[in-house]
Structures are given as structure tokens and as C-alpha cells.
Amino acid sequence: MKPRPFKEEFTLEERAKESAAMIASYPDRIPVIVEKFSRSNLPEMEKRKYLVPCNMPVGQFIFILRSRLHLSPGTALFVFVNNTLPQTAQLMGSVYESYKDEGDGFLYLCYSSEKTFG
């Protein structure tokens, strides 16, 4: 059974309260939600909520996601934020400041084996 998207599973108030608590407890980390693109044939993540260091490059976070998905070396993994591919050298804190959800405070990332949406 496919899990419901995080935004559908929890109310805006619940999500905002949770992200605020995470940031208060860990000010050097950002709250990130990682979900599979609906039409991707990649496996579902066991865990979709992450507390990521602000100074971690996007490429390092993608490496962590690859290992959690147990992907073979030849399997492509693309991570999108607002339907765009962030640069792998960009720091997660910078991506968060540019793309965080203003309503609930989480950064939403989507992963796929395809490089484009549509």
C-alpha cells in the first residue's frame, strides 16, 4: 500500500508545530521531508523525515538517500525541490532558505529515477 503524502497525513498546524520544535531543539539542522515521485519505479523510503545539517552539500544528502534505498550503482537517482534539480555542491541550508514551505517550515524533496517531470 502506498503511503499518503506527508501533507495529507498531518494537518498544517501539526506540521508547523513539529518543524518548529525540531528547529528549536536542533538549530544547526533543517527539517526535510523526502517522498517518492508518484510515477517513479524506485522503492519507497522506510523513513521520509530527516534532520539534515545546514552545512551538508546536496550531493552528500543524495548519497545518503541512495544508501537508504539500497540502489545498485547503475540506478539513477534524481532529487527535486519545487520541480527543479538543486546543484549537488549547494548546501542544504541554502536550499532550505530558498525552498522551504512557508506554511509548515519543512523542506520537501521528491526523488525519482527520471531526470524530468511530466
UniProtKB/Swiss-Prot annotation:
Protein name from the UniProt record: Autophagy-related protein 8D
Lipidation (Phosphatidylethanolamine amidated glycine): 118
GO annotations of cellular component type: autophagosome membrane; cytoplasmic vesicle; microtubule
InterPro entries: Atg8-like, Ubiquitin-like_domsf
UniProt keyword Iron-sulfur present: no
UniProt keyword Repeat present: no
Function according to Swiss-Prot or TrEMBL: Ubiquitin-like modifier involved in autophagosomes formation. May mediate the delivery of the autophagosomes to the vacuole via the microtubule cytoskeleton.
Known partners and oligomeric status: Interacts with ATG4.
Keywords annotated in UniProt: Autophagy, Cytoplasm, Cytoplasmic vesicle, Cytoskeleton, Lipoprotein, Membrane, Microtubule, Protein transport, Transport, Ubl conjugation pathway, Vacuole
Localization per Swiss-Prot or TrEMBL: Cytoplasmic vesicle, Autophagosome membrane; Vacuole membrane; Cytoplasm, Cytoskeleton
Lipid bilayer topology: Lipid-anchor
Family: Belongs to the ATG8 family.
The record's account of how the chain is modified after translation: The C-terminal Gly is amidated with phosphatidylethanolamine by an activating system similar to that for ubiquitin.
SUPFAM superfamilies named among the record's database cross-references: Ubiquitin-like (SSF54236)
Example of a GO MF term: phosphatidylethanolamine binding
GO-annotated biological processes: autophagosome assembly; autophagosome maturation; cellular response to nitrogen starvation; mitophagy; protein transport
Protein encoded by which gene: ATG8D
